[in-house]
A protein has these predicted regions:
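Short beta-strand segments
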Residues: 36, 114, 204-206
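C-terminal charged capping/lid subdomain of soluble metabolic enzymes
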Residues: 55-58, 157-236
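Structural motif
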Residues: 44-49, 81-83, 133-135, 196
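Active-site segments that bind and position negatively charged phosphate/pyrophosphate groups
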Residues: 70-184
Length: 236
């Protein structure tokens, strides 16, 4: 009944629950027999719930292609046209379906769907530690900015694209407040991420829109630089 459920949780058969303040610590792969999406439910959602789901759609656009991404940026979230949302929603679901069909158990390209989630999950867990929980999609939106900043440093992702998305994110989602005192806590939370291998924190980064690069090992110092740049970008 939420936009987030329709574009993310309902597709791909991955189930997970949080445990001990950490995201998705326990879970399984179990595809549904049937998934039915009705946009009528979305029309009664609070704005925060609409925004939360839309962040996952933005992620799908980033890993898919420039045309999909541009159509999402051009959609007016402040006054949603539900007829125009439907094809965007359908395309977003199909992006995830195509990736899941190719890699159902997340051994390869399905990891592209984790864009924004390594740092996003850390933001989300920190918000729970602060006892001021944030919606999942908001955490993903802010995580996208941080991980695109890493993408620029590691893969030369275009800085102008980051600036445009950051302005969009700030307009609709504002910014998650962090200081340098939070860096170690955020890093420690990231060490519990299920995508990590051999002691490395694994990221999905982007070379450009539509060209994700999975299993990127990022140094602690570079993660902290990304936090610095995030704070500079949002004037925190």
């Amino acid at each position: 009944t939420t936009l987030l459920g329709a574009v993310d949780a309902a597709v791909g058969g991955k189930t997970g629950i949080n445990f001990n303040g950490l995201k998705n610590e326990i879970g399984a792969f179990r595809p549904a027999d049937t998934v039915i999406v009705s946009t009528q439910f979305f029309q009664t959602l609070p704005q925060n719930e609409l925004l939360s789901g839309y962040a996952e759609m933005l992620k799908h656009g980033l890993i898919d292609n420039p045309a999909t991404y541009r159509s999402l940026l051009d959609f007016d979230l402040s006054m949603p046209d539900w007829e125009k949302l439907l094809p965007l929603l359908k395309e977003s679901i199909q992006v995830k379906e195509r990736i899941v069909a190719e890699d159902p158990f997340e051994k390869g390209i399905r990891k592209a769907l984790n864009l924004g989630h390594t740092i996003g999950h850390a933001f989300e867990s920190l918000s729970h530690k602060r006892e001021t929980p944030i919606p999942h999609g908001f955490a993903v939106a802010w995580g996208l900015i941080c991980e695109l900043l890493l993408s620029h440093r590691y893969l030369k992702f275009p800085s102008e694209t980051i600036s445009e998305l950051a302005a969009y994110i700030y307009r609709h989602y504002r910014a998650f407040p962090i200081t340098c005192k939070d860096y170690e806590t955020l890093y420690e939370l990231m060490t519990h991420d299920k995508k990590n291998e051999a002691g490395y924190i694994n990221f999905t980064l982007l070379q450009t829109i539509g060209k994700p690069v999975i299993d990127c090992h990022v140094d602690k110092e570079e993660i902290f630089v990304a936090f610095d740049l995030y704070r500079d970008l949002f004037k925190l």
